[in-house]
């Protein structure tokens, strides 16, 4: 089923109902369908041909959504760019993807006449040729191209097909949001270029209303939750923490809210408990990655007595834990998380060697270290590349970070390994705080909470921690800062 078919069927069923809103502007299902037709037709009229890549860097807004689905209807491939990235980042991705056109304020195409700013986009949406835009696309052909967040190195283009898109929608409607329908409202507080965008089509095709916030502010988010009577929303853990800090950790009066979905980065158990207290039994954690978007495992609202788990596999995903030889390990044993199913990427753009390595044996090798318990719940320990080996023992930074975040004064934490002559690597931590701390007292506080080899030797206090454009703390950048500091002291 083509994207255009999904939009047209929704327009036929829910015609004049509100489909999408942002600020004072609302489009009905029919209006949204026709707007995406005009935009798709306009792009084809500019000389683009099906299969061409179109780079898009747009803020949350209705025109951005029209661009995404107009591009899809025209058989073009959307290259998703994050507006928080730099112009240099955008240029690198545009060059790497071979994009012929670009839409946004901080992007430019190699073909000047195919560079469109926000005003150009608005004009194409209004003045584009009327009529159905429906270019067929093979299920395995590229549908969109996303770039990994860059937390583990150079970002790579991830090719997602219509097959993957359908599997993601099906996963949500079967497992995460089976009861949505007309009268429901999804509040998008996170960028729709990121994980929140995954929730748009499932709500649209069921006749629900998608409401977008142009940007995230915790006070505005809480007001909008109540004003629109949101039934569902999505937050990354950083946004969740900001919201709870703003609300003062008191239970929130949002009776229509049935799902607070979260994911996209690890969450500390202490933060999940705070969120459960504030929002009630509506939390749903969804685990995925760029190569298998947001639909590997799910921790349902009624399973949050297992805070710390990433949940159980979605219906559309087969998940195993394997050793270094790709052999499945026994229940309870630790290894790499691998995934198989229709949700998977087709591969990395122009990177056949990395594609073969990551998708070997038809399984996506996630690079995440985890284990299953006897009830089939997955527990993620860390990223393979982030494991610290100190004195021959494996230290999982996430475990240490989660423990640090239990301290009431600590707001953010990153734990990394620093080269050490005796231990191979020494455990060090960087934190940002809500109030001043004495680092020696915090290190003493960790005694009894962590084994000696896991405890940081040094605790650094910084105003803020480096993050990716998606809000993930960049351990790689933290590690480099500390190593540069050590080298600077040694060279002084």
Q: Which residues does each predicted region cover?
A:
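ATP-dependent adenylate-forming carboxylate-activation enzymes
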Residues: 58, 79-92, 106-108, 208-228, ...
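ANL superfamily adenylate-forming
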Residues: 107-139, 149, 154-155, 166, ...
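Conserved AMP-binding/adenylation subdomain of ANL enzymes
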Residues: 166-185, 193-232, 246
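Gly/Ser/Thr-rich phosphate-binding loop
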Residues: 205, 230-235, 244-305, 318
């Amino acid at each position: 089923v083509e994207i255009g078919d999904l939009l047209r069927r929704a327009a036929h069923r829910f015609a004049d109902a509100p489909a999408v809103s942002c600020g004072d502007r609302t489009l009905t299902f029919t209006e949204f369908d026709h707007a995406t037709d005009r935009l798709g037709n306009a792009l084809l009229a500019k000389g683009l041909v099906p299969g061409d890549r179109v780079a898009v860097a747009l803020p949350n807004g209705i025109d951005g959504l029209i661009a995404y689905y107009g591009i899809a209807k025209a058989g073009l491939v959307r290259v998703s760019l994050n507006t928080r990235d730099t112009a240099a980042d955008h240029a690198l991705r545009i060059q790497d993807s071979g994009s012929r056109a670009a839409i946004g304020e901080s992007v430019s195409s190699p073909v000047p006449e195919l560079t469109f700013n926000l005003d150009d986009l608005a004009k194409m949406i209004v003045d584009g040729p009327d009529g159905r835009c429906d270019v067929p696309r093979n299920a395995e052909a590229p549908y969109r191209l996303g770039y990994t967040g860059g937390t583990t190195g150079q970002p790579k283009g991830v090719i997602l097909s219509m097959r993957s898109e359908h599997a993601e929608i099906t996963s949500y409607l079967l497992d995460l949001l089976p009861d949505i329908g007309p009268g429901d409202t999804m509040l998008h507080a996170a960028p729709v270029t990121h994980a929140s965008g995954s929730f748009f089509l499932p709500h649209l095709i069921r006749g629900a209303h998608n409401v977008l916030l142009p940007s995230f502010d915790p006070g505005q988010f809480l007001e909008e939750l109540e004003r629109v009577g949101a039934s569902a929303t999505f937050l990354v853990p950083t946004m969740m923490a900001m919201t709870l800090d703003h609300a003062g950790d008191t239970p929130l009066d949002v009776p229509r809210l049935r799902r607070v979905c979260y994911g996209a980065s690890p969450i500390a158990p202490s933060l999940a408990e705070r969120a459960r207290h504030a929002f009630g039994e509506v939390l749903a954690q969804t685990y995925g990655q760029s190569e298998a978007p947001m639909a590997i495992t799910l921790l349902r609202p009624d399973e949050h007595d297992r805070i710390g788990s990433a949940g159980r596999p979605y219906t559309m995903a087969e998940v195993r834990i394997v050793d270094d030889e790709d052999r499945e390990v026994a229940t309870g044993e630790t290894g790499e998380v691998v995934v198989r199913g229709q949700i998977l990427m087709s591969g990395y753009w122009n990177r056949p060697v990395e594609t073969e390595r990551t998708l070997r044996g038809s399984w996506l090798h996630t690079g995440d270290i985890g284990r299953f318990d006897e009830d089939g719940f997955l527990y993620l320990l860390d990223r393979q590349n982030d494991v610290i080996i100190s004195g021959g023992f494996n230290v999982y930074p996430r475990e240490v970070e989660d423990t640090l975040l239990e301290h009431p004064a600590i707001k953010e934490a990153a734990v990394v390994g620093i080269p050490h002559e005796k231990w191979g690597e020494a455990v060090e931590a960087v934190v940002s705080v809500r109030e001043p701390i004495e680092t020696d007292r915090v290190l003493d506080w960790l005694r009894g909470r962590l084994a000696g080899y896991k405890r940081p030797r040094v605790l650094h206090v910084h105003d803020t921690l480096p993050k990716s454009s998606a809000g993930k703390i960049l351990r790689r950048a933290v590690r480099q800062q500390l190593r540069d500091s050590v080298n600077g002291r040694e060279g002084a």
